[in-house]
Design a protein with these regions (language model features):
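Generic structural signal for residues positioned in beta-strands
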Residues: 63, 138-139
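Short loop/turn microsegments at loop-to-beta-strand junctions
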Residues: 134-135
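Iron-sulfur cluster-binding cysteine motifs and their immediate structural context
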Residues: 139-140, 145-169
Length: 169
């Protein structure tokens, strides 16, 4: 049983933390359980947070893995260098293949890279809630078909339809 999630502010995204908190496993059996944290600069303590949430549900994590991806936090990282992004994506594909190999072989252990000490990651992750804002986001109104699909499917209810157009809320 696997849990794959991105790292946000060196921790778990709110939607993942909420999912793990609400998770009910009547009979998880004794299957191989793994986590994969995808990250840009650091895994922070996201893997530990996921393991703790699962342990609280009585589920032991056998393997903690990580895959470095293109960092998409645009206030700090320039995504216009297409070649640099392509190289990072190619490297990520190799890391994904290695993770798949470990999972298929049921090889346990913690191979998460680029962790940050708990206290530092905790302080930074505590700012996540105040930074999760959409006020600076915009949608291309001329490209919106008004179908409402984005608003219906947004897992955070961060998009609404107003006057037949989608808007961030």
């Amino acid at each position: 049983m696997g849990f794959v999630f991105p790292v946000h502010f060196w921790g778990l995204p709110a939607i993942v933390a909420e999912f793990l908190e609400a998770l009910t496993l009547a009979d998880a059996g004794r299957c191989f359980v793994y986590t994969v944290a995808t990250y840009g600069t650091s895994t922070g303590q996201a893997g530990w947070m996921a393991r703790k949430a699962l342990m609280d549900k009585g589920v032991a994590v056998d393997a903690g893995l990580s895959v470095r991806m293109v960092d998409t936090w645009t206030p700090l990282f320039n995504l216009t260098d297409k070649e640099k992004c392509r190289r990072r994506e190619a490297s990520a594909e190799k890391e994904i293949d290695a993770a798949i190999g470990r999972i298929v072989a049921c090889r346990g252990g913690n191979t998460e890279r680029m962790r940050i000490p708990h206290v530092i990651a905790g302080v930074y992750h505590a700012t996540y809630g105040s930074q999760r804002q959409t006020r600076h986001f915009h949608l291309m109104a001329d490209r919106c078909a008004g179908c409402g699909l984005c608003a219906d499917r947004c897992p955070s209810s961060a998009i609404e339809m107003r006057d037949g157009k989608s808007v961030w809320v």
